Each structure stands twice: as structure tokens, then as C-alpha cells.
Amino acid sequence: MKDVLERFLGYIKVDTQSSEESDTVPTTKTQLEFAKKLGEELKAIGLKDVSVDESGYVMATLESNIDKKVPAIGFIAHMDTSPDLSGTNINPRIVEKYDGQDIVLNKEKNIVLKINEFPEILEYKGQDIVVTDGNTLLGADDKAGIAEIITAMEYLINHPEIKHGTIKVGFTPDEEVGKGADHFDVKKFGADLAYTLDGGGIGELECETFNAAKAKVIIEGRNVHPGSAKNKMTNAVLVANKFINTLPENEVPERTEGYEGFFHLLSVKSEVETAELNYIIRDFDRKKFEERKEQIKEVGKKINEEYNKEIVCVKVEDQYYNMKEKIDEVKYVVDIAYDAMKAIDIEPILVPIRGGTDGSRLSFMGLPTPNLFAGGHNFHGRFEFVPVLSMEKAAELVVKIAELYANR
């Protein structure tokens, strides 16, 4: 599985950031260009039925090499990188045989990956680790997943003695902006079940995601000359401040963990005349999720009552739901992944995803899709890193899962 590093380093050279602002599909042209390159690579290694549609979805098939019928399994990763930090001109560095000390990413800017801030890196002492130069994210989320899947497919093609059923490969655009499954054709894909490789550190096996919604809060103020503003001006900036401070201060990402939900204020655009707040709402428990949506609406309602006019408008839109309720219906998909990890000497770590994957939506579209580790850490930022061995083991895991299904 040594080719996985070379593939990964090649993929991250292509800037495939998605965009929250764009209405095109995919949201950026570079994703479509990257999709076409991946399509050509899949053809070159010998996959069949390779397609790249106008929306940027890549699909391909590795045909079964056994006579008996077993479930067709899919492996899925996303092509875009997060809009949270630049993915242009990524300049990776391989830290060989990591010595367990702080890693200076950028000496000139004094950007250091510190072990007291990111202690999980100590788990990889002695291993080769790919890091950034401190100016961009790395793109292991999720180009590591793509590299792992393609490397595994090539390995299976080159080792026909490993028996497997039909395998479907899928690469999606715009996962980072919540649109990865919008135009995914489950019927065309043709898998009975699937796995995304979009998780974090080695061993992660995830079948629970947040329930997710987004909220846009529009505040209409009224600007009047400050010299004569008494009882006339409505300062949207101050109303926005009131709205923000009315929500629970401890129910935010930086103060929650595990199964705890939160309100996350993504952005504020504000002046006296108008203000706009953009939130995401997350909770694992469906009942608490619904309560959170009502809670944020209630804040707007109370402010309107206080001002005795409709100055706050709160619009809430669901994004995806906790896939656990769908995965539980076909629990064996998790059991096989668990057994596959054990078989290749990986200790499975069953954890909830404090986020979402394409699998969240796909599971509710009829394709049960738990999530496997891709190996990276600290996604969406300059401190992102991925151990080389973790990528190699992820590729090995894909092969082992295919093998276990063939032997069921």
C-alpha cells in the first residue's frame, strides 16, 4: 500500500475548496476538473463503468471475482476541501520518524504544532507524518480517503487471489458545504451498503452523526442621526448582541464534547440599519435537536415582543439527521468493519461523529453508510496532519472489508 502517500501528495496539489457562496454545481470549477482527473485514473487502473457527471460525481465499479452473490459494497470519499482555510498552493512536509517534540511548521511566522495543544500527535511518535507549512490546510480531509480507496482498488486488481464481490467507488463534491449528497444517484451507484472514508485518527469507526440544521437571523434596525435618535433609532448591532448573549454561553463548540450539542455562530454582518447572524445547530438526540431549533426561534420572538415590532426574523433549515437510526437497521455493516480492523491489528474506536459526512444523508436515501477513519487530525486548519502509516492501514482496511464480505 506504499502508493497511497504518492497519490495523496499529488491530489493535494489541486485546490478543490468548495464555496458557501456559490450556487453552481459543483460550487467550484476546480472540483469538476479534479473529478475528471480521478475518472481517468480509475480507468487507467482497470475499473469499469467509470463516469463523471456534470455535477462532478465520480462513480466506478470493480467487478466481482467470485461466483456467489454477496452484497455490493461502496467506498466513498469527497473531493472538496474546507472553505475555512486556504487550500491553494499547499506545501506539505514529511516529518520522518517523528521524535515526539513540537513541530515548527513555519519558522518565519512562528507557527508551531505544539504537543501541549495537540497531544494526540504523540501517539505517532516514531512514524512519518505529513504536515503543512502553516499557511494552508493539508487536505487530508478528504483526499487521504480518495488516495486510500484508489490504492486499495489497484491492490485488489493486482492481487486476484483476494476474493471479493462487486465494489462500487464514489467521489463526491461539496461535502464541506453540506451538499455532497444533493445530486448523488443512489440507484446508479448500485451498492447495497457503503462506507465513507472521512474519519479522523486510525481506528475510528463511526455510525452516529449529529442532527444538523442551520439558522439565519435577519435583524432590521432603523438608523436615525445620533443627535436626535432618542426613542427613534433601533440599532441592529445592539439587537444582534442581545440575540447572541441570550443563547446559552456554554452550549458552543469550544465548550462541548462527546454527545453534547451546541449552537455555533458562524458569522456576523452588522451595522445600525441591519444585521445578519448565521448559526449552525447540532445535537445527537433528535428530541433535543428539535428543542434547540425552537429555542433559537424563541429568542427572536421574545426580542420582537420586547421591541413591540417584528425586527428579528429567524429562518431554520434542516441539513441532515443522525444516521444511527438507519445504520441500526443493518448493524452487520458496522460489525464487519469492526472485525476487519481487528483482523489487521487495528483497535476499533467506536465514537460519534461531532459533525456530518455524506453518509449521514446517504443513509436516509437508502444507502446505509457508516464512516471509517482516513487517518488525519485537526481538519480544516493549518495544524492538520496525517501519519503515513494511518493512510496505509486505511487502504488495507478497505481490502480486508471487501474480503470479509466475500467470505460471509
Curated annotation (Swiss-Prot):
Zn(2+) 2 binds at D141, E176, H380. Zn(2+) 1 binds at H78, D141, D198. The active site is at D80, E175. It is found in: Cytoplasm. Its EC number is 3.4.11.4. Its main location: cytoplasm. Transmembrane segments: none annotated. GO terms for cellular component: cytosol. Keywords: Aminopeptidase, Cytoplasm, Hydrolase, Metal-binding, Metalloprotease, Protease, Zinc. GO terms for molecular function: metallopeptidase activity; tripeptide aminopeptidase activity; zinc ion binding. Signal peptide: none annotated. Disulfide bonds: none annotated. CDD domains: M20_peptT. Binds 2 Zn(2+) ions per subunit. It is an enzyme of class 3 (hydrolase). One of its GO terms (biological process) is peptide catabolic process. Its cofactor is Zn(2+). PROSITE patterns: ARGE_DAPE_CPG2_1, ARGE_DAPE_CPG2_2. It catalyses: Release of the N-terminal residue from a tripeptide. It holds the Pfam family M20_dimer. NCBIfam families: peptidase-T, PRK05469.1, PRK13381.1. Belongs to the peptidase M20B family. Cleaves the N-terminal amino acid of tripeptides. PANTHER family: PEPTIDASE T (PTHR42994:SF1). This is Peptidase T. It comes from Clostridium botulinum (strain Okra / Type B1). The gene is pepT.
